[in-house]
Amino acid sequence: REKIEAAVHELGYMPNLAASALASASSHTIAMVVPNLAEAGCSEMFAGLQQILQPAGYQIMLAESQHRVEQEEKLLETLLASNIAAAILLSVEHSTTVRQWLKNASIPVMEMGAIRSDPIDMNIGIDNVAAMYELTEMLIQRGYQNIGLLCANQEQWIFQQHLHGWYKAMLRHHMSPNRVINAALPPNFSTGASQLPEFLLAWPELDALVCVSDELACGALYECQRRRIKVPDDLAVVGFGDSDVSRVCQPPLTTMAVPHRKIGSEAGRALLERLNQGNWSDRKSIASSLCMRESC
């Protein structure tokens, strides 16, 4: 029995609980597992998926792993044994066990949100390297010389992608890429406010700050107001995401827009193509776009 269990684990075998009853039936349920329903862009991507999949007769079963590896494994173990037509995940880190299960599953698997170098199967999202490069390049072209980068509590692979784009732009213009803080804190308003003084203490020459989320950037803007630092005259601040808050903070925030709804709808179309015809390319990059406002 131990040998059988070891072989089952090694092969990533998952018994189909509905196989006897549904062997001849085709499922129209697609499972979507997300770390947190409040994750940036999650609701917009879900809406994009629904827009395409629902008219085609597919229903999306949404589950939340709460950023817990064991919870994601438990959810997917149940879902993969329940005759689902496809699985959708956000572009986040997954355990070796989950990756093995999904690679061995005879269903389409879509990771969406950001382009990965090692997708499980299908992958649609923005290119974080290109997006960060474009955001940094824009500041350089506008004459800023002493630019900093604020990151906070990102998945390591996303941090590396942002850092790659940042280094690429800065080194292309022979500028120092070393003004970087990667805070082990949530990417929220209070972190942005608390980290700005750290930048000014370490690099008083700072004239522009790139933040990897709009919430971080708006927190930095609030701290600038408290310290009577004029934005953008004394310090330019830019964000990432084009969230609602970027439009209402003062001054309105220049940011990199991520087309979450389009990512969702493109993922839906790709899944339909795979489900109906059995073919689709592994990856597709969706362009992000600069939203120029008054903070730089």
Q: Where do the model's predicted regions map?
A:
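Short beta->alpha connector loops
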Residues: 66-69, 90-96, 215
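Bacterial carbohydrate/catabolite-sensing allosteric modules
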Residues: 10, 47-59, 74, 80, ...
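Amphipathic helical "hinge" segments at domain boundaries
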Residues: 11-78, 82-86, 164-168
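Short conserved active-site loop signatures built around small residues
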Residues: 4
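Flexible glycine-/small-residue-rich
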Residues: 34, 91, 113
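Redox-cofactor binding/interface segments in oxidoreductases and associated redox assembly factors
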Residues: 32, 89, 211
